[in-house]
Amino acid sequence: MERMNQSRKVPIHDAAEESSAEAHETQEAGNMEEQAREAEIQQEMAEEAVEQAQDAEEAQEEEAADYKDLYLRTLAEFENYRRRADRETNEFKKYANETLIKDIIPVIDNLERAMECTVNTDDPGCAQNLLAGVQMTEREILKVLEKYGVTRISAIGETFDPAYHQALMAEESDEHPDETVIREMQKGYLLKDRLIRPALVAVAKGKA
C-alpha cells in the first residue's frame, strides 16, 4: 500500500508543475500579444506622423509656389504699369518738342537782326518790303512756337528776375528804379513752365 501511494504522488506533482508552466506560457503569450499590439499601435502612430509631416511639407511647398506665382505676376503687372506710365507721362507730353523749339529760336534771332539792318538802308521802299516780309515770317514762327506752348519772357520795364533774366550790364539811369530791365539784347523763352533760354538784358542802377 505504501508503495502504491508513493507511485500516485508523482503524477500529482507533475500535473501541478505542468499546469504552472502552461499558465506561465499563457501569460507570456499574452504579454507578447500585448507588446505586439503596442508595437503595432506605435508603428501606426509613427506612420501617421510621417504622413502628416509629408502632407504639411507638400502644403508648404504648394503655398510657397503660390506666393512665388503671385510675386511674379505682381512684378510683371508693376513692370507693365511702369512702362505705360513712362509712355503716357505728362512730362513727355509737355516737353517732347524741346529740341525742335531750341532749333527754331535761332531763326527768330536771325530775323530780328535782319529787321534791324533794314532800318539803315538807303532804299526806303525796299527796306519797307523786306521789313514787312521779315515781320510776317517772325509772326508765323511765333505762332508755331505758341502752338507748342512756347512764350516769350517779358523783360523791358520788368524788375530784374534771375529766374528769367540774365544781366549782361548795368546802366545808370534817373528814369528807372534800380534793378529795372531797361534794354533787351536777346529775348528769352519759356516752354510752358520750363525756362528754355533766359532773356539777356541790361538793368538800371542809380547814379553814384
Curated annotation (Swiss-Prot):
GO terms for molecular function: adenyl-nucleotide exchange factor activity; protein homodimerization activity; protein-folding chaperone binding; unfolded protein binding. Residues 1-27 have a biased composition (Basic and acidic residues). It holds the Pfam family GrpE. Keywords: Chaperone, Cytoplasm, Stress response. It comes from the Bacteria. Residues 45-64 have a biased composition (Acidic residues). The keyword Cytoplasm applies. GO terms for cellular component: cytoplasm. Residues 1-65 are annotated as: Disordered. GO terms for biological process: protein folding. It is found in: Cytoplasm. The keyword Cytoplasm applies. Homodimer. HAMAP family: GrpE (MF_01151). Participates actively in the response to hyperosmotic and heat shock by preventing the aggregation of stress-denatured proteins, in association with DnaK and GrpE. It is the nucleotide exchange factor for DnaK and may function as a thermosensor. Unfolded proteins bind initially to DnaJ; upon interaction with the DnaJ-bound protein, DnaK hydrolyzes its bound ATP, resulting in the formation of a stable complex. GrpE releases ADP from DnaK; ATP binding to DnaK triggers the release of the substrate protein, thus completing the reaction cycle. PANTHER family: GRPE PROTEIN, GRPE PROTEIN HOMOLOG, MITOCHONDRIAL. Belongs to the GrpE family. This is Protein GrpE. It comes from Desulfatibacillum aliphaticivorans. The gene is grpE.
